[in-house]
Amino acid sequence: MCSPRDFRGNKYSHRVWCYLGKVEYLTTEGRKQVSYWSAKVIDEKTFTANAEVDEIKWVAVTKVRELLSMETDKEILDKFMKIKFDTKPLILLRHAKAITRDEWQGDDDDRPLDTLGENQSKRLLPMYQVYNLSQIHTSDAIRCYNTVQPIARGLNLKLEVTAKLSESTYRKDKDKAFDYAKELLKSEINAMICSHNPILPKMLNKLTKKSDVDADEEKLSPADGWVIHRNGKEIIQIDRLDAPLV
């Protein structure tokens, strides 16, 4: 278990699984907050000591507790030991901030991202590349396509563009987007769906209806996402990732 920044900073290639929680503590520079995920190292590089880390040591889970002094760290360990590993992510991402409907005179599917949305889209790759995505599916609306294009380019993936995930199709047939997502959920594919706010909350509710995991009741803001972690047919956990700070 580790923060993704620590993995990257110490040059470990890794794949992220379930979110474990946050730890806060005081330093000489003020309050510090660290978020933890379970993860798997894919490619271990030679480590060189630096200003933040003197040594990296792999420790068996059964022996970690005796090395921890903070209760909050022990709580993170407890959650780590309870969850299932090797989950497959299905990510539901709302498009980044777009020009408002009042500001746009053309077809709504052609409504582009505004300046904030363009900046958000450029910062999504570091957040989502750790999920080892192999497919990205997007609504054919320009604002969705342009949101995930930088991710696809960074991961060298071809975008799967479909009208089935668009608002215009949803208004005519509300089942098409859900059926599309359901097939991806049943697959063993690490995938992302980029769509719209009227669609994604209902999609999440339907996908998790028969699971033991509660769906998030709060709607997504632009560039927010949900990560559905699944192991076989079982949904293990749903993580919410807020939009990148710009």
Predicted regions and their residues:
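The catalytic Nudix box helix
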Residues: M1-Y19, A60
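Short, solvent-exposed aromatic-acidic interface loops
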Residues: D239-V246
